[in-house]
Design a protein with these regions (language model features):
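Structural signature of nuclease core domains in nucleic-acid processing machines
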Residues: 1-102
């Protein structure tokens, strides 16, 4: 599977799931990863004749480097898998904008 992986160096008081979600929302990384996902989706459509979002795209992995602790599995790791429907809708929306400009 293909994943979007991004490293973050944010200094947070806590690197548990709730703190990471708050950081994702505060910094608008959720918007960032949706844009990344649309870009990867478009690339895969062009490169793979049998591309299927559910089968080939594994999701988002944001690694908060300061929070990764081997003794605390999952600490410093944010994961998400945006729904295919959302990615297809965004892709169509961006395509319309490109056509409107042309």
């Amino acid at each position: 599977k293909i994943f979007v992986v991004d490293y973050k160096s944010n200094s947070l008081p806590d690197y548990g799931p709730a703190a990471l979600l708050q950081s994702i929302q505060d910094q608008e990384y959720d918007l960032q990863y949706l844009l990344y996902t649309v870009a990867v989706h478009r690339w895969l459509v062009l490169r793979m004749t049998d591309y299927c979002y559910d089968r080939h795209f594994g999701g988002i992995r944001y690694l908060y480097a300061r929070g990764i602790t081997p003794s605390l599995p999952g600490s410093g790791l944010f994961t998400d898998l945006p729904p295919e429907r959302l990615i297809l809708s965004l892709d169509r929306c961006f395509s319309r904008k490109e056509q409107d400009r042309g």
